[in-house]
Regions:
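N-terminal lobe/hinge region of extracytoplasmic solute-binding protein
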Residues: 57-109, 139, 202-204
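Gly/Pro-rich hinge or "lid" segments in bacterial periplasmic/extracellular proteins
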Residues: 92, 96, 175-176, 181-238, ...
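Surface-exposed binding/hinge segments that line
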Residues: 106, 150-192
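Ligand-site clamp/hinge motif
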Residues: 225-270, 390, 398-400
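Extracytoplasmic/peripheral linker and loop segments enriched in polar/acidic and small residues
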Residues: 394, 398-409, 435-501, 527
């Protein structure tokens, strides 16, 4: 059940398309009746049924679970956000932005945007959704006190103000034709003006919050006042966390839950061979990366970083760890198939001799090194760490692997040690990905890597209206990250979900498993 790989919007509404429209008409308007499809057309499916309750198990569940969009950082958080809140735009299966709470976006220069809101939309408590809610929801991410996970994205928002009863004018610091894509980011969903207590989950999404126990369970019931006619279909959804892959699979096949994510590639045959159950593969830009920070003098050495990259046996990872459900990576975050992928960048191969030379040069061979922290919650990271350990032993490199519990890993270990693994969900565009994870001042800059030329290219690419020039800029950024960056990205991993075949309407959106975390409003129960 494979779908097309994440193509960054290829075949959809590209930057060049946007600029052509601006040039031809003096004004670009993207809306439900215009160049972008209506939201529902992207998810057309036969004869949805109404009613029923399902339980869904996600691998990411901990006491850090949140209902505050600014604080969300896991797939489970994003699932909650799309259950209880709605964004101005929404991505479809081709990563083309669709209008959602916004009825249209208009601009003449990609810097000043007029956002027209849908009329008649209400929050779960009955309050109408208005311009003040949008202004607050976008601009709160700029406030350092909010500690937003998407502050680097929000820094682009120079000013937002209500300019009509259903209208917001958003002015950017510099032109960015990707704004419709950026507004689909999970953290940028719309909340009530002035909200600081998110415990009630008041939004205007397809489900209303019934109960929320961080690390245990989230229950939502259908919002009968949802603004999309006929949706959602289910009466109730319970989202639980089961970090152990085997336990999560057993919960599915025993009938305890009806949908799970992050299936171990070694278990795919068990799912497909069990009557009544099916596997959903979504090819994507998901990657698990080895993070090499500068906290340790040996790890800080560029020769150590490059040596570790050569130590990865990428083909072995693809076949043995991911069982073919991945494509080989090249230590930069743009996957093959993406329209800005740099195919001319030479692929780094497994080269133990070169790795040994570089690691010897860095003083790493025979030295006591900090352990590599890995967890089952970062797809394949434990297996990657063990394979690196085994490859290192052959050349005199002593690597220790610390298998950390998934509960609290992202709060207590990720980015907190010289050697850790990350697990990065795909982003809606190259700009969003590079801004959140590689810009020098990004909170999620995993390795703490800083490169002034990279930052300059990133900012220049946003306002570049010539798509060929922009592709060259993104290509140059990929070269810089691959050759000078401090993360090893050996593979891009398919999302693997398992589901009860009575659950219908489950599609693929390459930003994440479970339909890009947006399954809640799209699935129904054929009992």
């Amino acid at each position: 059940m494979s779908d097309d790989i994440d193509n960054g919007g290829k075949g959809g509404f590209t930057r060049r398309d946007m600029m052509k429209v601006m040039a031809a008409g003096g004004m670009m308007a993207v809306g439900a009746g215009g160049l972008l499809m209506t939201p529902d057309s992207a998810f057309a499916a036969p004869a949805p049924k109404r009613g029923g309750k399902i339980r869904v198990a996600n691998e990411a569940g901990s006491t850090a679970d949140t209902l505050d969009p600014a604080k969300g950082s896991t797939g489970a958080d994003y699932t909650r956000f799309f259950m209880f809140y709605s964004g101005l735009t929404q991505l479809d299966a081709s990563l083309t932005p669709q209008m959602n709470l916004a009825e249209s976006l208009q601009t003449t220069d990609a810097k000043t945007w007029i956002i027209k809101l849908r009329k008649g939309v209400t929050f779960h408590d009955g309050k109408p959704v208005g311009p003040a809610d949008v202004v607050y929801s976008l601009m709160r991410h700029k406030n350092p006190a909010t500690a937003s996970k998407v502050k680097p994205l929000a820094e682009q928002f120079a000013e937002a103000k209500a300019t009509g009863p259903d209208e917001v004018t958003l002015t950017l610091a510099s032109a960015n034709a990707d704004l419709p894509v950026i507004l689909a980011t999970p953290q940028l969903v719309i909340v009530k003006d002035g909200t600081t207590d998110f415990s009630t989950g008041i939004g205007c999404g397809p489900y209303k919050l019934k109960s929320f126990k961080p690390g245990v369970s989230t229950v939502g019931v259908r919002n009968d006042s949802y603004f999309k006619p006929g949706k959602p279909y289910l009466d109730e959804i319970e989202l639980i966390g089961i970090s152990d892959s085997a336990a999560r699979l057993n919960a599915l096949l025993s009938g305890d839950v009806h949908l799970i994510n992050a299936i171990d590639p070694r278990s795919t045959q068990r799912v497909s061979s069990t009557p009544g159950y099916a596997l959903k593969e979504t090819k994507s830009g998901l990657y698990t990366d080895l993070i090499m920070r500068s906290d340790n003098p040996i790890v800080a050495n560029p020769d150590f970083v490059e040596g570790m990259k050569y130590l990865f046996d990428r083909e072995q990872l693809r076949t043995a760890v991911f069982r073919g459900y991945s494509v080989i990576g090249n230590d930069q975050p743009i996957p093959p198939g993406h329209r800005y992928f740099n195919a001319s960048l030479p692929q780094r191969a497994h080269d133990p001799d070169k790795a040994k030379f570089l690691l010897q040069k860095a003083g790493a061979l025979g030295a006591t090194l900090p352990p590599i922290y890995a967890t089952s919650d970062a797809n394949g990271s434990i297996e990657m760490a063990v394979l690196l350990q085994q490859a290192g032993q052959k050349i005199g490199l002593n690597l220790q692997v610390n298998r950390a519990s998934p509960d609290g890993y992202w709060s207590n270990h990720w980015m907190k040690h010289p050697l850790t693994f990350g697990n990065i969900n795909p982003r809606s565009s190259a700009d969003v990905l590079f801004t959140q994870f590689f810009k020098s001042d990004a909170p999620w800059n995993e390795s703490g890597w800083k490169n002034a030329k990279f930052d300059q290219l990133l900012l220049a690419a946003r306002s570049e209206t010539d798509d060929a020039k922009r592709k060259q800029m993104y290509g140059d950024m990929q070269v810089i990250v691959s050759q000078q960056g401090r993360v090893g990205i050996p593979a891009f991993i398919s999302f693997l979900d398992g589901y009860d075949k009575r659950l219908a309407g489950l599609g693929s959106i390459p930003t994440g498993g479970m339909m890009g975390f947006m399954f809640a409003e799209n699935v129904w129960w054929n009992a």
